[in-house]
Amino acid sequence: KAHFHVDGVQALGKIPMQLEDVNSISFSGHKFNGLKGQGILIIDNKEKIEPTIFGGGQEYGIRSGTVNLAMNVSLVKAMEIAIQNLNELNHRLSRYNKVIRECLGQYKGMYINSPENSAPHILNIAFPGVKGEVLVNAFSKLDIMVSTTSACSSKREKLNEVLLAMGIKDNRIAVSYTHL
């Protein structure tokens, strides 16, 4: 039986989650208004995980080091608020998404790749014939911050191999809205 891990970084506070068949899931605090540098790893069976940092045995022996109680408490509070406000946030982001789609729909030669019924907090758009870097610069002059990559892969020189395999070119940008 394979270990089923879910990268839930974009999920917490944005989509309802059912974790019955998940062996592990990870979240990043800053994606739901926690502090940067915080994360959560939930594992169904901690015996399956080998520690990478050895020492005092904190964090159930999986990650030794002094526990930052203040950061942990703030992370739990941010998580509670994100889950509590999920429906309200999705309603607001759906409205933003609709307005942005309507505005972008006025421009010829521009494609919205995200389906109408997709997650309301992410929008993938393409401008055939225009490189992503040019789009980022043009939008930034309008004080609209967009990216051609995720923050965790922004140092890469080339397009993500998975996106290339999906036939996605470098003329697309992804817009993700957060807890505004």
Which residues are covered by each model-predicted region?
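Conserved PLP phosphate-binding loop immediately N-terminal to the Schiff-base lysine helix
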Residues: 1-28
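Active-site PLP attachment segment
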Residues: 21-59, 64-76
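A short linear hydrophobic-aromatic micro-motif
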Residues: 25, 109-113, 146-150
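Predominant activation on well-ordered alpha-helical scaffold segments within soluble catalytic domains
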Residues: 69-80, 101, 136, 140, ...
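Conserved C-terminal alpha-helix-loop-beta "cap" of PLP-dependent enzymes
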Residues: 123-173
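Conserved small/polar residues in nucleotide/adenosyl-binding loops
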Residues: 178-179
